[in-house]
């Protein structure tokens, strides 16, 4: 199945349309594939962002993606804190912050040892707002609210340098929730490392590993909540729900969610 792009009177999300045109497609046999695994198009609207937060709350998804990570943070953050802190106050930069819950444990533990300043970073303004609201309620230190909160990895180096000052010399970067798995790992890690100061900054990377069978992993993703979240990308291209079909597979050493387009579609700008 493939997209056909023509002009008519249908209204679509032009950002998604242009991004798909810019990226182009790859071929698998006679099938054209548009890769949007990097998540740039996942949270463009409030509806998309909230649909993801709803998915996070699902029991199976939360257990697989977040519960174990939070348990590990609770167990090891005291030891990590002792290794990380170098005497200065610390900026906690939360990359792909979501609603901020992944940063709660690090903030609570670090704030007992030094002065902390929290800076959420996400491509979704809705996520940033939710993270600022959640972390502000902890009352554990300053929460940075400025234009660079809404950023991708291209701006990370600017953010880290803007936050560094005489009091807050050190940046502690959080990259949790297996967010790194949504990107080409070498490219994204290059951007992260470039934003760090050697000998001063630290990165805490969270990646989900599992010894479950592929069939078990697939089952936890093949849900209505997953479909409700990811289908919003195609619905903004004026597809109807019955014109697309979600599939889940285990390939390239990871779970992949994809959509088959059941018929050609005309698009307009």
Feature names for model-found ranges:
Residues 2-93, 100-149, 157, 162-168:
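Rossmann-like AdoMet
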Residues 101-103, 127, 181-183, 211-215:
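Short catalytic/ligand-binding loop motif for oxyanion handling, primarily in non-cytosolic enzymes
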Residues 121, 180-181:
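Conserved catalytic-core segments centered on acid/base and nucleophilic motifs
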Residues 153:
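Hydrophobic pocket-lining residues within nucleotide cofactor-binding pockets
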Residues 174-175:
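A conserved beta-strand element that flanks and buttresses the S-adenosyl-L-methionine
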Residues 181-194:
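A short, conserved alpha-helix within the catalytic core of class I
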Residues 199-212:
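Conserved beta-strand signature within the Rossmann-like core of class I S-adenosyl-L-methionine
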Residues 210-269:
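SAM-dependent methyltransferase
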């Amino acid at each position: 199945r493939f997209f056909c792009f023509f002009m008519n009177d249908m209204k679509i999300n032009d950002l998604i349309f242009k991004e798909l045109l810019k990226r182009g497609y790859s071929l698998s046999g006679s099938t054209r594939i548009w890769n949007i695994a990097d998540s740039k198009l996942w949270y463009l609207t409030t509806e998309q962002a909230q649909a993801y937060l709803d998915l996070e709350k699902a029991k199976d998804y939360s257990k697989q993606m977040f519960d174990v990570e939070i348990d590990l943070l609770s167990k090891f953050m005291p030891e990590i804190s002792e290794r990380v802190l170098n005497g200065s106050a610390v900026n906690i930069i939360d990359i792909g912050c979501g609603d901020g819950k992944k940063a709660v444990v690090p903030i609570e533990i670090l704030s007992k040892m030094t002065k902390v300043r929290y800076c959420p970073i996400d491509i979704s303004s809705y996520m940033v707002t939710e993270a600022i609201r959640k972390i502000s309620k902890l009352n554990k230190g300053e929460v940075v609210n400025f234009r660079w909160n809404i950023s991708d990895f291209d701006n990370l180096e600017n953010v880290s340098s803007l936050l560094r000052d005489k009091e807050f010399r050190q940046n502690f970067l959080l990259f949790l929730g297996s967010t790194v798995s949504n990107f080409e790992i070498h490219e994204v890690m290059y951007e992260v490392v470039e934003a760090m100061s050697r000998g001063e900054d630290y990165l805490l990377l969270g990646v989900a590993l599992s010894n479950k069978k592929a069939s078990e992993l697939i089952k936890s993703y093949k849900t209505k909540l997953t479909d409700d979240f990811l289908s919003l990308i195609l619905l903004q291209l004026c597809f109807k729900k019955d014109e697309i079909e979600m599939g889940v597979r285990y390939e390239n050493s990871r779970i992949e969610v994809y959509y088959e387009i059941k018929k050609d579609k005309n698009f307009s700008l």
